[in-house]
UniProtKB/Swiss-Prot annotation:
This is Probable transcriptional regulatory protein Sare_1779. One of its GO terms (biological process) is regulation of DNA-templated transcription. PANTHER family: TRANSCRIPTIONAL REGULATORY PROTEIN YEBC-RELATED, TRANSLATIONAL ACTIVATOR OF CYTOCHROME C OXIDASE 1. GO terms for molecular function: DNA binding. NCBIfam families: PRK00110.1 (NF001030), PRK12378.1 (NF009044), YebC/PmpR family DNA-binding transcriptional regulator (TIGR01033).
Length: 249
């Protein structure tokens, strides 16, 4: 199992510093605004917006902030920015492949910040297509282990299009084709199983095993990249043990 998947499910628990928490809130709100602009402001008819709102709520973003983001995105309130999605490819220390997804209103600024973060932390920019082939777009649902078992999750999602269920330590990861994400999420809801997040994500097909020094370097690079207001998600193909991740956490 990819070490980055495990890291991604726990990193929000590390956002104890107000500045980090504020950045996380801003990115979740931006996600809601863009989802509303792309597919309309009604969550019932816009599954991407529904999932963005649920993720924001589960990370304690105030409802008022969420509501305003929906209104800005759907044109009911002024102040929305013209955000564009840009994907940059790169390598981190030890040849770890990186896809850096930006949601920005200034492509030049985003590219400069990503390039600076990479070069200052043992990474490098990569040509388009040289990294992306190592990842596949998947629907990813994270389910907390509390009160449920892997068999419960499997039983609920198997007929809904789920491809596999992975044990991430404190949670289960359910993978599907992106088009089956809503069906999988709905199947869990129908079975009374709470989920932490449901979203389209990029999952690596191969992983690079890292020792503790290598893991420390790549996690530092990811932290620096995610510190940029323009960077929404960083996908990486490293693999580390649960024990090592706990020590570094």
């Amino acid at each position: 199992m990819s070490g980055h998947s495990k890291w991604a499910t726990t990193k929000h628990k590390k956002a104890v510093i107000d500045a980090k928490r504020g950045k996380m809130f801003a990115k979740l709100i931006k996600n809601v605004e863009v989802a509303a602009r792309t597919g309309g402001g009604d969550p019932a008819g816009n599954p991407t917006l529904y999932d963005a709102i649920q993720k924001a709520k589960k990370n304690s973003v105030p409802n008022d902030n969420i509501d305003r983001a929906v209104k800005r995105g759907s044109g009911l309130e002024a102040g929305g920015a013209d955000y564009q999605t840009v994907m940059y490819e790169g390598y981190g220390p030890n040849g770890v492949a990186l896809l850096i997804e930006c949601l920005t209103d200034n492509r030049n600024r985003a590219a400069t910040e990503v390039r600076t973060a990479l070069t200052r932390n043992g990474g490098s920019f990569a040509d388009a297509g040289s990294v992306s082939y190592l990842f596949s777009r998947k629907g990813v649902v994270i389910v907390a282990k509390a009160g449920t078992t892997e068999d419960d999750v499997m039983l609920a999602v198997l007929d809904a299009g789920a491809e596999e269920v992975n044990d991430l330590g404190e949670s289960f990861e359910v993978l599907s084709e992106p088009g089956d994400l809503v069906a999988v999420r709905t199947a869990l809801q129908d079975a009374g199983i709470e989920y932490e997040s449901a979203e389209s994500s990029l999952v690596p097909s191969v992983s690079v095993p890292l020792d503790e020094d290598g893991a420390r370097k790549i996690l530092k690079l990811i932290d620096v990249l995610e510190d940029s207001d323009d960077v929404q998600n960083v996908y990486a193909n490293f693999d580390v043990s649960d024990e090592m991740l706990a020590r570094l956490g």
